[in-house]
């Protein structure tokens, strides 16, 4: 597992640069599309802003990219301002050159949630699997809506949300926890781990314990982030604030071996060089 330390609030920028790098290396075509797994939430917003910039400036195209989002609230229509459909189109898809037929998001209003989840997994297999899955992490270490205690063998399914997650997410619902959906459709831990690469972005002091548990402690189903230790090509990129609970030796070790990769401004500059 790789671990990259960036400046504060720059993990999302690093993620954007890495997406561009991987798509360019893949060199997608209409016959061979790049498959990207995408998150929602606060941390990825800057990543999407940066990717929109790169797209408008001709640095990258999404015409031959297929996307699968991680999750969606149960019971929210696509037009609801807090649905992840609304989030993705408003903050990303409406501003880039992606073919909307290549966008895949779970339907929180489906008549049969089990069937919706089964078809989602089936479609991922049909396109050859996910090449790169992006994600954030919750304060309790959850990825997507794989809350503490989620099976590492889990697949896309409906998942009940913990009280902590509902309270945290209430900030998007006028701080009214009664308006927050009680469950969501989410890709499973195995769905994420099956991706060829996984990149998790961690920003802020409130994520410091989750980062510590994911990197320095053993694999534990109560900390979903720790499953990444089992992935052959997992990357965690975190800002300085998120490193607050790491051992000094761990911090210094990764800063040293990844010293060529944490100067985000230099990495962005390199994208503009032909």
From Swiss-Prot:
It comes from the Bacteria. PROSITE patterns: GLC_GALNAC_ISOMERASE. Gene3D superfamilies: 3.40.50.1360. GO terms for cellular component: cytoplasm. Its EC number is 3.5.99.6. One of its GO terms (biological process) is glucosamine catabolic process. The active site is at residues 71, 140, 142, 147. Pathway: Amino-sugar metabolism; N-acetylneuraminate degradation; D-fructose 6-phosphate from N-acetylneuraminate: step 5/5. Keywords: Carbohydrate metabolism, Hydrolase. GO terms for molecular function: glucosamine-6-phosphate deaminase activity; identical protein binding. InterPro entries: Glc/Gal-6P_isomerase (IPR006148), Glucosamine6P_isomerase (IPR004547), Glucosamine6P_isomerase_CS (IPR018321), NagB/RpiA_transferase-like (IPR037171). CDD domains: GlcN6P_deaminase (cd01399). Coiled coil: none annotated. It catalyses: alpha-D-glucosamine 6-phosphate + H2O = beta-D-fructose 6-phosphate + NH4(+). It holds the Pfam family Glucosamine_iso. Belongs to the glucosamine/galactosamine-6-phosphate isomerase family. NagB subfamily. NCBIfam families: nagB. Catalyzes the reversible isomerization-deamination of glucosamine 6-phosphate (GlcN6P) to form fructose 6-phosphate (Fru6P) and ammonium ion. PANTHER family: GLUCOSAMINE-6-PHOSPHATE ISOMERASE. This is Glucosamine-6-phosphate deaminase. The gene is nagB.
């Amino acid at each position: 597992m790789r671990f990259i330390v960036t400046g504060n609030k720059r993990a999302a920028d690093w993620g954007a640069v890495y997406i561009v790098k991987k798509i360019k290396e893949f060199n997608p075509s209409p016959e061979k599309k790049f498959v990207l797994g995408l998150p929602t939430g606060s941390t990825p917003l800057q990543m999407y802003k940066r990717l929109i910039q790169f797209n408008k400036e001709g640095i990258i195209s999404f015409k031959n990219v297929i996307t699968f989002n991680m999750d969606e609230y149960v019971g929210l229509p696509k037009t609801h301002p807090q649905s992840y459909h609304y989030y993705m189109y408003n903050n990303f898809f409406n501003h880039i050159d992606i073919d909307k037929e290549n966008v895949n998001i779970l339907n929180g209003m489906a008549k049969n949630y089990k069937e919706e989840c089964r078809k989602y997994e089936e479609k991922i297999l049909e396109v050859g699997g996910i090449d790169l899955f992006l994600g954030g992490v919750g304060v309790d270490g959850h990825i997507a809506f794989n809350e503490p205690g989620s099976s590492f063998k889990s697949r896309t399914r409906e998942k009940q949300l913990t009280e902590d997650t509902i309270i945290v997410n209430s900030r998007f619902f006028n701080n009214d926890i009664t308006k927050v959906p009680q469950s969501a459709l989410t890709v499973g831990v195995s769905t994420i781990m099956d991706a060829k690469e996984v990149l998790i972005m961690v920003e802020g002091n409130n994520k410091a314990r989750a980062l510590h548990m994911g990197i320095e402690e053993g694999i534990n189903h109560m900390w979903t982030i720790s499953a990444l230790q089992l992935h052959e090509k997992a990357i965690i990129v975190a800002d300085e604030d998120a490193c607050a609970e790491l051992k000094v030796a761990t911090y210094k070790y990764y800063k040293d071996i990844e010293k060529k990769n944490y100067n985000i401004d230099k990495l962005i500059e390199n994208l503009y060089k032909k």
